[in-house]
A protein has these predicted regions:
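Conserved substrate/cofactor phosphate-moiety recognition/catalytic segment
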Residues: 19-58
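Conserved lysine of the Walker
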Residues: 14
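Pre-Walker A (Motif I) flank of P-loop NTPase domains
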Residues: 1-3
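Hydrophobic anchor at the beta1->P-loop junction of P-loop NTPases
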Residues: 6
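Glycine-rich phosphate-binding loop used to anchor ATP phosphates in small-molecule kinases
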Residues: 47-97
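Conserved small/polar residues in nucleotide/adenosyl-binding loops
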Residues: 134-139
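The conserved Walker
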Residues: 10
């Protein structure tokens, strides 16, 4: 079983996409807002975001160890936060240039390492394509992981 990270700015469509993907893979869902709420930790500083990435990683690894596919959606704004999260497959939801929160916009570093690049808010279109790529015996056998928005 594997862990998928769906990352991007607030309002980009991460949760919507993850919610569309989960039933296609019979996956367990981890939503960063819900995990943060359960921990009652509303610190959005760099240190708070590291704690959140570690919490998300711990929860994802527990579900994976129980034999589940896991889809986690969270901002993962920095390379450090992304390194802390044990994703087997990374989806960058890159549909907006600025999110709702200025501090997050300032902190967010566009990912360099990802397996799929979503460029439009069309989760019903993207979810099956991502799941096909993810479950393909050799994902690189498909023409590209950066499918055009018209695909």
């Amino acid at each position: 079983m594997k862990i998928i990270l769906v990352m991007g700015l607030p309002g980009a469509g991460k949760t919507t996409l993850a919610d569309e993907m989960a039933p296609l893979l019979n996956a367990k869902r981890l939503n960063a807002d819900e995990v943060r709420k359960a921990a009652n930790d509303w610190d959005f500083s760099a240190e708070g975001r590291v704690r959140q990435a570690k919490r998300m990683a711990e929860a994802a690894l527990k579900l994976k160890a129980e034999g589940h596919y896991v889809i986690a959606d969270f901002i993962a704004p920095t390379p450090e936060a992304r390194k802390l999260f044990p994703a087997d497959f990374r989806v960058w939801v890159d549909t907006i240039k600025e999110g709702r929160f200025e501090d997050t916009n300032l902190m967010f570093v566009n990912p360099k390492n990802f397996d799929f690049h979503v460029t439009t808010q069309d989760a019903k279109n993207w979810a099956p394509k991502i799941c096909l790529l993810y479950t393909s015996p050799s994902p690189r056998d498909l023409s590209t992981s950066r499918m055009p928005s018209s695909a």
